[in-house]
Regions:
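Domain-level signal for soluble alpha/beta catalytic cores
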Residues: 1-386
Length: 386
């Protein structure tokens, strides 16, 4: 999909454009779209005509946790993908869109990671059978949701490759809702197979420039920005945004100069904004595979060197997993070296218990392939295995 030396232009704010065409507040957007197919076709054709190289299909909330019970997940996604294809033709890329389910993962909520993976697999199976050009995992607020979605893609796309974009949304703290900083999110997403990474919603383009500066030294994949049209404000009972298309275009140039390769718009960005982006003719920064060592928990990353303070632990079959997790969380160190000397049952219980605690990043030590597979599946960060 990537064009040599040129940015890829995504679409803009589909939801707000649909509201202009009659989508009421509080209804299921996917169900409304199926009942009003001309509305989504109008919006997506407008973005294509404005210069979008790739358009997100309206499958954002088309999962079993958000859809009404009478709608079949597979059929709903298939129909929404078909409407998108009819709107944009075959010369524009179509992306299957995945978003948060609205339910929190355990222990903040009741949903398990295994259940979330199965929820996403239902959508992705429809993407696979339809033949989408790429998949986007967007507006993610919990890095574990990102990991589950990427694992679901791996489970469905075992015999062919489909590019996967990941974009997260940040709070005013500069971190995801569950505390993951942008660099850690990038490293975890890359480790689990993301083909591009970045940000959507959250803020205007001006606030995304320093975020790119943080990521570029460590990014081995293209970087995405899909910002809002500045800050929202209420005017005459309506939400309007602070940046017009020309000011947005000015900042998009800065985004590209600071490392963005794939650019679109989120809240408040109409086809006019996408047209402004498409008028830009500026080269993108070359992407290279970065070589460095790191260990990440879900909230922090350590780049080991001579000054790194390590704590050494051993996990055995005699270990009580939950208490052990708290021992690790209390360790006075930068990172943990954990020798695995237990069976799969104890390791699984330990890894599941990590979701209850915030531990320093862990470097796992085992040459057992079955145990390595469990670590890849259940670890809450992205940690190397020795």
């Amino acid at each position: 999909m990537l064009k040599k030396n040129e940015i890829i232009i995504l679409d803009g704010a589909t939801g707000t454009e649909l509201h202009k065409l009659g989508l009421p507040a509080g209804v299921c957007p996917e169900e409304w779209i199926l009942a009003h197919p001309d509305a989504i076709k109008t919006v997506q054709a407008a973005y294509k005509n404005a210069g979008s190289d790739a358009v997100y299909a309206p499958t954002f909330g088309a999962n079993r946790k958000k859809l009404p019970a009478h709608l079949d997940v597979y059929e709903t996604n298939r129909k929404l993908l078909q409407l998108c294809r009819e709107a944009i033709g075959t010369d524009t890329f179509i992306g299957g869109d995945i978003s948060p389910t609205g339910e929190l993962l355990y222990p903040m909520g009741m949903m398990t990671e295994d259940e979330l993976i199965s929820v996403y697999e239902e959508q992705i199976k429809a993407f696979y059978d339809f033949g989408v050009d790429f998949i986007v995992i967007e507006t993610m607020m919990d890095i574990r949701e990102v990991k589950c979605a990427l694992l679901a893609v791996q489970h469905i796309y075992q015999d062919k490759k489909c590019p996967v974009f990941v974009t997260v949304t940040l709070e005013e703290t500069g971190k995801m809702l569950t505390g993951t900083d942008p660099l850690t999110a990038l490293l975890i997403a890359q480790a689990y197979g993301a083909d591009a990474f970045g940000f959507n919603c959250s803020s205007g383009p001006d606030k995304m420039i320093p975020l790119l500066d943080t990521l570029v030294p460590y990014a081995s994949v293209p970087l995405i920005t899909k910002p809002n049209a500045g800050l929202p404000k209420e005017t005459d009972g309506k939400t309007v945004f602070s940046m017009d298309a020309e000011e947005f275009k000015k900042y998009v140039r800065y985004l590209v100069e600071h490392g963005a390769d794939i650019i679109g718009g989120c809240c408040g960005t109409t086809p006019e904004y996408i047209k402004a982006i498409s008028d830009l003719k500026i080269p993108v920064m070359p992407i290279s595979k970065k070589q460095f060592s790191f260990v990440s928990s879900r909230r922090e990353t350590v780049f080991p060197d001579e000054a790194t303070k390590w704590a050494d632990f051993t996990l055995t079959n005699d270990t009580e997993p939950e208490d052990f997790c708290y021992d690790l969380a209390d360790a006075d160190c930068d990172a943990i070296r954990l020798q695995i000397m237990c069976d799969e049952t104890v390791l699984t219980a330990f890894l599941e218990g990590l979701s209850l605690t915030v531990t320093p990043p862990i470097l796992y030590q085992t040459d057992n392939k079955a145990l390595q597979k469990l670590i890849y599946r259940y670890d809450t960060g992205a940690s190397f295995i020795e």
